[in-house]
């Protein structure tokens, strides 16, 4: 029995092959005492091992990292070499310390790789076990043996738990290096360990691991480097103790192999059990203004302000009482669940956006169902007016954080605000892992094997699922009918599901009270973003509250138009009857001339608007919301049904008058999740919270679960006084359609933005197109399309003029003047030079421009 202290899984991107479970399965199979995960420069896999390690009680789980050591992290040039170094954490504090090291290596040391210096590890030395790593280590790369002795003594002087590392490989370079390590061990009196530097669970997996490396390096089977690489990795799998002896006894002798393996167990004994910080999400402390004792008091203050802002103080007593009752109920739920602070954080960054001149969306997702959100200006959709349900957003019968999604025009500026306010170590974006799908596997592996690209593109289109087995179910004869692709299919099957790349989640932001490093380390994004090494599925599981902030380009379009026109905001407020019932806007939508209009620019959407022209000409805002809710692949049947009934077709048989009342606004079609909640509440006698639990269960589309929940609902409907026939019809209707319904709060929020952009296009087409051109100035195809559309709306677009055009498109005497930076080959930099030259010398000639180009 030995401990494997140097291992890579597929979170060593395009280098390791095995999944965490595959690696631990192999560890169990060969009887390991301990297993350490040491991926290259990251901690991506830590959470996944922690989730499953209880299934392997006989194996001690050790967390570590193969770091990139360099002399000085501030030197970033080709002469700055880096080397591999293994770092294992000894205890809980060591886990946090390693997080700090990895984070710093990304933020300050990144140069091709996240690099760290020995000085960065020094403060935490007692909490680490360090080993000298592989052929890419400093000792392996140094040819001067005396210097190697100096390096070993330096490591030992800093790290009380330092080990030299041999590896059980038969490659000539490794055999020579193992002899070197043995000699260094004797001279410096330093213990050594033996590892396998495994990049795959089993020997036969190395074939597929080699293909991953080829994908990462963009090499083919015929490349000399690819052949040499497969030789170097020949022994990089999880070997049995017998295999290690077979490989190493002839190199260093049986007794030394026994010593090296025994030392791996001694290292494992040095290490305490370490766990990832799985816990309930910890809401950070909101910095209250002076004079408020707690979050609840300040939130009520904002609500009272919003009450007046929304004009509720001018409503009749009955309408006011309805809203007061709703607010009291919502606040009782929010406060009892401890979420007052969550609303304050969202309110704060939305307020900051407004102060920074950044356009904010009307709402997104289910939050528009909250009157508290509306009164606090978190959303701009009145939930009472549109019949939106609070429990669809926050259910007192289902424990879970609120999920307030916020759309903004400039996401980066809001994140900067959060970092400036709370500190860069307390705010993070969230990592996103991209896995190799069958489609990607076919094209990538086809490239390696030398198949023509077009041939692989055509073949890959037959793979329509993200899972290989599902693809085979839909194409059972694909492999049999294409024997020429046997090798391709075999490799693609084995690579499907492996991690290929990492990116940043489009919306998620984490804010913590202490430091993100207490939870997980951070990596640096392409544009300097601070990204926690935990994805959206587990960010809340490790105790971090997630806020969703999404960048929406249309909001920048709207902001630009508003800045140009300086209109009274009431003119385009959905609560203004003149705006909501503007015939010119509905006519534009019904014409299908909706290029640039939010969410309805596609050919399919335009066709749908034209089909629904009779309904739109009735000034029915509901139609826009329904279109946005139904235009999805899994709802096309319901969409056709709605169009037929909305344009004079016969309605389906009535199940019950009470159900008709709930569905009448959508032409007796069930469209929204909120309608399902109303039906379950009315007929089943449940609360909205209980009805939402039914919605969640049905939405999982698990056959047995749907049958079980439907049966419960049938009985509830009968118990509530309805006939068994009615109960069966309702339960059948909900179970068949309930999983495909849409969130009304979301569709209404987006319908408002759709209507707003259509209104600007209908009433102020010149400024609309000017802004539309600016938002697409780097897309020549889009510009040409929109110029043609502008002609239909009688908007003239003047060609660029070197002495009059600005950087961007502008309005000049009622016409749109082409912007310099949108000209192919000019860009912003040269545009600035032209404008500066113009300002200094009056005019710029074509000759002068040509001189700048050369």
Where are these regions (language model features)?
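Positively charged, low-complexity/disordered segments
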Residues: 852-854
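Glycine-rich loop at the start of a catalytic domain that most often binds anionic cofactors/ligands
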Residues: 43-57, 76, 207-210, 374-384
């Amino acid at each position: 029995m030995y401990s494997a202290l140097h291992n890579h899984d597929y979170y060593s991107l395009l280098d390791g092959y095995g999944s965490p479970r595959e690696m631990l399965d192999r560890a169990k199979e060969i009887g390991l005492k301990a297993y350490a995960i040491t991926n290259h420069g990251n901690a991506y896999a830590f959470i996944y091992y922690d989730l499953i390690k209880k299934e392997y009680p006989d194996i001690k789980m050790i967390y570590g990292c193969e770091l990139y050591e360099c002399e000085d992290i501030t030197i970033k040039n080709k002469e700055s070499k880096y080397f591999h170094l293994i770092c294992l954490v000894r205890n809980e504090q060591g886990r946090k310390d390693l997080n700090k090291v990895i984070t710093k290596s990304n933020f300050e040391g990144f140069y091709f790789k996240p690099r760290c210096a020995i000085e960065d590890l020094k403060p935490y030395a007692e909490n680490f076990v360090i080993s000298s790593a592989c052929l890419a280590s400093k000792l392996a790369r140094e040819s001067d043996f005396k210097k190697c002795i100096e390096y070993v003594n330096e490591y030992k002087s800093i790290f009380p738990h330092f080990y030299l590392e041999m590896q059980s490989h038969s490659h000539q370079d490794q055999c020579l290096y193992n002899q070197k390590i043995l000699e260094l061990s004797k001279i410096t009196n330093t213990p050594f360990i033996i590892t396998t530097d495994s990049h795959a669970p089993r020997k036969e997996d190395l074939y597929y691991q080699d293909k991953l490396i080829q994908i990462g390096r963009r090499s083919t089977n015929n490349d000399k480097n690819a052949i040499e690489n497969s030789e170097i990795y020949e022994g990089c799998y999880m070997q049995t103790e017998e295999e290690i002896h077979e490989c190493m006894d002839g190199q260093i002798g049986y007794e030394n192999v026994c010593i090296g393996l025994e030392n791996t167990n001694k290292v494992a004994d040095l290490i305490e059990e370490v766990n990832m910080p799985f816990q309930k999400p910890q809401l950070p402390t909101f910095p209250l203004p002076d004079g408020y004792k707690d979050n609840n008091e300040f939130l009520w203050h904002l609500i009272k302000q919003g009450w007046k802002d929304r004009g509720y103080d001018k409503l009749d007593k009955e309408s006011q009482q309805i809203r007061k009752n709703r607010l009291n109920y919502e606040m009782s739920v929010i406060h009892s669940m401890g979420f007052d602070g969550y609303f304050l954080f969202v309110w704060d960054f939305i307020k900051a956006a407004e102060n920074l001149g950044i356009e904010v969306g009307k709402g997104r997702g289910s939050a528009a169902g909250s009157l508290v959100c509306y009164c606090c200006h978190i959303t701009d959709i009145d939930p009472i007016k549109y019949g939106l349900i609070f429990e669809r957003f926050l259910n007192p019968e289902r424990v879970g954080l609120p999920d307030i999604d916020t759309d903004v025009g400039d996401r980066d500026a809001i994140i900067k605000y959060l970092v400036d306010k709370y500190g860069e170590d307390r705010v993070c974006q969230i990592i996103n892992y991209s896995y190799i799908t069958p489609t990607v596997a076919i094209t990538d592996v086809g490239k390696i094997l030398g198949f023509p690209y077009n041939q692989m593109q055509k073949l890959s289109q037959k793979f329509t699922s993200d899972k290989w087995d599902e693809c085979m179910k839909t194409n059972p004869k694909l492999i049999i009918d294409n024997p020429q692709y046997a090798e391709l299919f075999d490799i693609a099957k084995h690579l499907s599901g492996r991690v290929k790349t990492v990116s940043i989640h489009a919306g998620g932001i984490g804010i913590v009270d202490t430091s993100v490093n207490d939870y997980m380390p951070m990596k640096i994004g392409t544009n300097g973003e601070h990204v926690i090494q935990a994805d959206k599925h587990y960010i809340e599981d490790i105790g971090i509250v997630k806020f969703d902030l999404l960048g929406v380009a249309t909001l920048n379009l709207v902001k630009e138009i508003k800045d140009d026109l300086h209109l009274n905001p009431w003119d385009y407020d959905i609560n203004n009857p003149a705006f909501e019932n503007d015939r010119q806007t509905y006519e534009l939508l019904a014409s299908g001339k909706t290029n640039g209009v939010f969410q309805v620019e596609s050919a399919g959407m335009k066709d749908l608007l034209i089909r629904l022209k009779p309904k739109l000409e009735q000034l029915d805002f509901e139609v826009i919301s329904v279109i946005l809710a139904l235009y999805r692949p899994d709802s096309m049947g319901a969409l056709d049904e709605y169009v037929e009934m909305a344009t004079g077709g016969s309605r389906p048989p009535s199940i019950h008058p009470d159900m008709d009342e709930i569905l009448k606004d959508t032409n007796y079609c069930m469209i929204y999740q909120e309608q399902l909640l109303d039906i379950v509440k009315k007929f089943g006698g449940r609360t909205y919270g209980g009805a939402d639990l039914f919605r969640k269960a049905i939405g999982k589309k698990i056959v047995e679960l749907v049958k079980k929940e439907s049966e419960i609902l049938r009985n509830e409907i009968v118990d509530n006084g309805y006939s068994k026939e009615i109960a069966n019809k309702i339960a059948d209707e909900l179970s068949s359609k309930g999983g495909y319904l849409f969130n009304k709060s979301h569709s209404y929020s987006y319908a408002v933005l759709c209507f707003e952009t259509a209104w600007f296009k209908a009433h102020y087409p010149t400024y609309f197109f000017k802004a539309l051109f600016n938002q697409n100035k780097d897309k020549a195809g889009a510009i040409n399309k929109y110029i043609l559309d502008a002609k239909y709306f009688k908007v003239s677009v003047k060609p660029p003029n070197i002495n009059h055009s600005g950087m961007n498109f502008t309005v000049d005497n009622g016409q749109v003047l082409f912007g310099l930076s949108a000209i192919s080959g000019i860009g912003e930099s040269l545009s600035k030079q032209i404008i500066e030259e113009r300002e200094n010398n009056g005019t710029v000639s074509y000759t002068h421009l040509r001189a700048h180009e050369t």
